[in-house]
């Protein structure tokens, strides 16, 4: 079923020396208060020549009665950046005497590592979906394509936030973040559109392999600067003018690796020179690319909570619908604004749903 907030979970934050700096408890929403942590100077993460780690990594231990514990090592904290750490706890089995500890390790972003990229470009005549659709959820294989790793289903926006947080630094200038996020969204949509893996008999859309596709670390920290942009542009992608297909937006870090696609570090200096996200993208991809958007979503039914949403419903499923309706409102201003609290199905959400259903003849 859907996720339920865990009230009263204990969270301990440990500094790099292993000393406990905070002990927190989750509230009725399953969240803790925000806390401030010491870290490095922000400017270090804007310098491609800085060879150290431009952030301080903290460890987080999450415990709750009846659940297995979670230990996250290397949670990256940047100056003036809000880091959001999801924590999904798995219930203990009845046969278990004591909780196990599940571990997540967060490495430095791909832009700072020297992994060789071998992102393969699809041939134009591969199986292709006629319409550009957002796979929600997207199925991610947690390893290289032929490995026996697990597949996970992830909300598309959460997937993009995770990849961007795993690929680049959240401190980069806004235009640089946007250019990279457009490339990340488009790369994923290209894999789905060309059915790159599914046409080869695999049961997933994309892998978490930095070499073959783009970095994804299940359960990792995400950053508010990235999260905010993704919520705004997750249904926009790069294509050539006059073509529907998502362009093959390959990329690499541009320091230890160079490629024919976008240079992640290169976007920083271009943004600092005042270029817009589209100008930055045109610097690396053909000049006739444009940003398009799609309002087609597939797979929404598979994430259907099993009960109809109605006034008084609460939770992530409601929030998903509110996010979509607010996004669609930009193009369909007849849909009234949602003023309800996120995740709460109140009168304004009901009004927006009703109008959406009539606009799209769904009633």
List each language-model region with its residue ranges.
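Short, acidic Ser/Thr/Gly-rich low-complexity loop/linker segments typical of extracellular
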Residues: 19-46, 332-334
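Short, ordered, surface-exposed loop/turn motifs in non-cytosolic proteins
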Residues: 2-28, 318
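Acidic/polar residues in short coil/turn loops that connect beta-strands
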Residues: 1, 27-29, 342, 363
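Surface-exposed coil/turn segments at beta-strand junctions on protein surfaces, enriched
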Residues: 25-27, 51-55, 78-80
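A short, solvent-exposed loop/turn motif at the edges and junctions
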Residues: 42-73
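Short amphipathic, basic-aromatic surface patches that mediate peripheral association
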Residues: 1-2, 44
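Conserved, single-site charged/polar hotspot
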Residues: 8-12, 35-37, 61-363
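Short, surface-exposed loop/turn motifs at beta-strand boundaries within globular domains
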Residues: 4-6, 17-19, 53-55, 131-133, ...
